[in-house]
């Protein structure tokens, strides 16, 4: 990925450490800005996003959030039992392509995307962008699941378990709540890494 994230570039590697100080060059002179991202999907296809949540982190604080239901490309919602979202809930919602301008504006100053189990959310983001003819996203990703496994000795490192460990409120499988929780988890892990003098690579 390019040093500043965003669109374009020719890299595709999963991102740097959770104690990341920023990209090389000019970007290194400004603090990184993170956006925790969470998708819920309607079916087994990664382009079936039916909800998205984002929470922006700058200098150790959550500074903004964004949430929307999304109308998926197919009417059959298979995972209502997971997230509670039905076709009736999303049939009048914007498609990913229609929502994208608002999401892109939110991500305008973001240098890194963050997710708990980042490969899943990255795959959904890439598939949705491809489905609507949008440029391939090139933000480096930080995976708080991988980071928590390295940093915390817990029986489980699922999002709800790690949130219980830190006392982070969570309405699990609500994309807005999951994104906000991942952002708070990032802040906790960064603080803990700094105190230990470590650079935790997700």
Segments predicted by a language model, with ranges:
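Active-site phosphate/pyrophosphate-handling residues
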Residues: 123, 146, 180
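Conserved non-catalytic scaffold segment of RNase H-like nuclease domains
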Residues: 16-138, 153, 159-173
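Intrinsically disordered, low-complexity repeat tracts
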Residues: 2-4
């Amino acid at each position: 990925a390019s040093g500043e994230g965003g669109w374009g570039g020719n890299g595709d590697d999963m991102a740097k450490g959770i104690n990341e100080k920023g990209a090389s060059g000019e970007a290194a002179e400004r603090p990184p800005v993170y956006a925790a991202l969470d998708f819920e999907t309607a079916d087994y296809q990664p382009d079936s996003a039916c909800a998205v949540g984002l929470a922006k982190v700058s200098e150790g604080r959550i500074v903004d959030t964004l949430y929307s239901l999304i109308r998926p490309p197919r009417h059959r919602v298979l995972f209502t039992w997971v997230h509670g979202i039905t076709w009736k809930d999303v049939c009048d919602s914007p498609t990913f392509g229609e929502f994208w301008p608002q999401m892109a504006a939110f991500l305008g100053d973001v240098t890194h995307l963050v997710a708990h189990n980042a490969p899943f959310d990255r795959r959904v983001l890439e598939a949705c962008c491809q489905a609507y003819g949008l440029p391939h996203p090139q933000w480096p990703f930080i995976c708080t699941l991988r980071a928590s496994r390295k940093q915390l000795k817990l029986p489980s490192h699922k999002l709800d378990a790690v949130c219980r460990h830190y006392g982070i409120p969570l309405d699990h499988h609500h994309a807005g709540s999951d994104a906000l929780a991942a952002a708070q988890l990032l802040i906790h892990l960064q603080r803990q890494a700094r105190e230990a003098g470590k650079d935790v690579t997700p």
